[in-house]
Design a protein with these regions (language model features):
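Shared catalytic-loop signature of beta/alpha-barrel
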Residues: 1-108
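C-terminal extensions of enzymes
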Residues: 92-132
Length: 132
Protein backbone atom coordinates (compact mmCIF):
# COMPACT_ATOMS: atom_id res chain seq x y z
CA UNK A 1 0.00 0.00 0.00
CA UNK A 2 2.78 2.44 0.89
CA UNK A 3 4.17 2.21 -2.63
CA UNK A 4 0.73 2.71 -4.19
CA UNK A 5 -0.30 5.93 -2.44
CA UNK A 6 1.19 9.35 -2.96
CA UNK A 7 1.56 10.21 0.72
CA UNK A 8 3.94 8.84 3.34
CA UNK A 9 2.45 5.98 5.36
CA UNK A 10 3.19 5.90 9.09
CA UNK A 11 2.85 2.88 11.36
CA UNK A 12 4.30 1.21 14.41
CA UNK A 13 2.33 2.48 17.36
CA UNK A 14 1.19 -0.99 18.43
CA UNK A 15 4.25 -2.97 17.38
CA UNK A 16 5.98 -4.55 20.34
CA UNK A 17 9.27 -5.84 18.98
CA UNK A 18 12.29 -4.77 16.96
CA UNK A 19 11.46 -7.66 14.65
CA UNK A 20 8.15 -6.04 13.75
CA UNK A 21 9.97 -2.86 12.75
CA UNK A 22 12.63 -4.84 10.87
CA UNK A 23 9.83 -6.37 8.78
CA UNK A 24 8.22 -2.97 8.14
CA UNK A 25 11.56 -1.58 7.00
CA UNK A 26 12.48 -4.63 4.89
CA UNK A 27 9.17 -4.57 3.04
CA UNK A 28 9.10 -0.77 2.80
CA UNK A 29 5.60 -0.90 4.30
CA UNK A 30 5.93 2.62 5.74
CA UNK A 31 7.96 5.80 5.29
CA UNK A 32 7.53 6.98 8.90
CA UNK A 33 7.92 4.73 11.93
CA UNK A 34 5.94 5.41 15.11
CA UNK A 35 7.55 3.34 17.86
CA UNK A 36 6.06 3.67 21.35
CA UNK A 37 8.56 3.05 24.17
CA UNK A 38 5.69 1.99 26.43
CA UNK A 39 4.62 -0.75 24.01
CA UNK A 40 8.02 -1.64 22.58
CA UNK A 41 9.66 -2.58 25.86
CA UNK A 42 11.34 0.59 27.02
CA UNK A 43 13.79 3.27 26.09
CA UNK A 44 16.64 0.99 24.96
CA UNK A 45 14.42 -0.87 22.50
CA UNK A 46 12.97 2.42 21.23
CA UNK A 47 16.47 3.78 20.63
CA UNK A 48 17.47 0.63 18.73
CA UNK A 49 14.45 0.98 16.45
CA UNK A 50 15.14 4.69 15.92
CA UNK A 51 18.80 4.05 15.04
CA UNK A 52 17.86 1.22 12.68
CA UNK A 53 15.33 3.50 11.00
CA UNK A 54 17.99 6.20 10.67
CA UNK A 55 20.29 3.78 8.87
CA UNK A 56 17.56 3.46 6.21
CA UNK A 57 16.89 7.23 6.13
CA UNK A 58 13.49 6.74 7.74
CA UNK A 59 12.16 9.25 10.26
CA UNK A 60 10.54 8.33 13.56
CA UNK A 61 7.53 10.06 15.07
CA UNK A 62 6.88 8.28 18.36
CA UNK A 63 3.35 7.39 19.29
CA UNK A 64 1.67 9.21 22.18
CA UNK A 65 3.33 9.78 25.60
CA UNK A 66 4.93 13.14 24.74
CA UNK A 67 6.18 13.37 28.32
CA UNK A 68 8.15 10.16 27.78
CA UNK A 69 9.15 10.55 24.14
CA UNK A 70 10.27 14.20 24.11
CA UNK A 71 13.69 13.25 25.49
CA UNK A 72 14.02 10.41 23.01
CA UNK A 73 13.30 12.57 19.97
CA UNK A 74 15.90 14.99 21.27
CA UNK A 75 18.46 12.19 21.32
CA UNK A 76 18.16 10.97 17.72
CA UNK A 77 18.85 12.66 14.41
CA UNK A 78 15.87 11.24 12.54
CA UNK A 79 12.99 12.38 14.75
CA UNK A 80 10.23 14.04 12.78
CA UNK A 81 7.88 15.08 15.57
CA UNK A 82 6.50 14.02 18.91
CA UNK A 83 2.81 13.22 19.09
CA UNK A 84 0.90 15.27 21.65
CA UNK A 85 -2.62 14.60 22.88
CA UNK A 86 -4.53 16.88 25.17
CA UNK A 87 -5.97 15.08 28.20
CA UNK A 88 -8.63 12.65 27.08
CA UNK A 89 -11.05 12.02 29.92
CA UNK A 90 -11.63 8.37 30.86
CA UNK A 91 -9.11 7.10 28.33
CA UNK A 92 -5.63 7.81 29.55
CA UNK A 93 -4.46 8.18 33.15
CA UNK A 94 -0.75 8.92 32.76
CA UNK A 95 -1.17 12.69 32.74
CA UNK A 96 -3.23 12.46 35.91
CA UNK A 97 -0.22 11.31 37.93
CA UNK A 98 2.05 14.13 36.76
CA UNK A 99 2.45 17.28 38.81
CA UNK A 100 3.75 19.14 35.77
CA UNK A 101 2.74 18.29 32.24
CA UNK A 102 4.47 19.33 29.06
CA UNK A 103 2.48 22.01 27.27
CA UNK A 104 3.12 23.02 23.68
CA UNK A 105 3.79 26.65 22.90
CA UNK A 106 3.57 27.81 19.29
CA UNK A 107 3.58 24.18 18.14
CA UNK A 108 6.73 23.24 20.05
CA UNK A 109 7.52 21.48 23.32
CA UNK A 110 10.61 22.40 25.27
CA UNK A 111 12.61 19.40 26.48
CA UNK A 112 12.77 19.57 30.30
CA UNK A 113 16.22 19.91 31.82
CA UNK A 114 15.38 17.92 34.95
CA UNK A 115 17.22 14.62 35.59
CA UNK A 116 16.10 11.40 33.95
CA UNK A 117 12.94 11.75 31.93
CA UNK A 118 12.17 15.02 33.65
CA UNK A 119 8.85 13.78 34.99
CA UNK A 120 7.50 15.29 38.20
CA UNK A 121 5.08 12.80 39.73
CA UNK A 122 2.11 13.78 41.88
CA UNK A 123 2.35 11.42 44.86
CA UNK A 124 -1.23 12.16 45.99
CA UNK A 125 -2.57 11.32 42.54
CA UNK A 126 -0.58 8.09 42.50
CA UNK A 127 -2.05 7.16 45.88
CA UNK A 128 -5.58 7.53 44.45
CA UNK A 129 -4.76 4.81 41.92
CA UNK A 130 -3.29 2.42 44.52
CA UNK A 131 -4.99 -0.94 44.90
CA UNK A 132 -4.85 -2.41 48.36
Amino acid sequence: MAAAVGIPVATGEIHSSRGDFRDIIATMAARILQPDAGVLGGISEWMKVAHTAASFDLPVAPHWHADLHIHLVGAVSNALTVEYFFLEEDIYNFERILRERLVPSHGQIRIPDRPGLGLVLDEAAIERFAVR
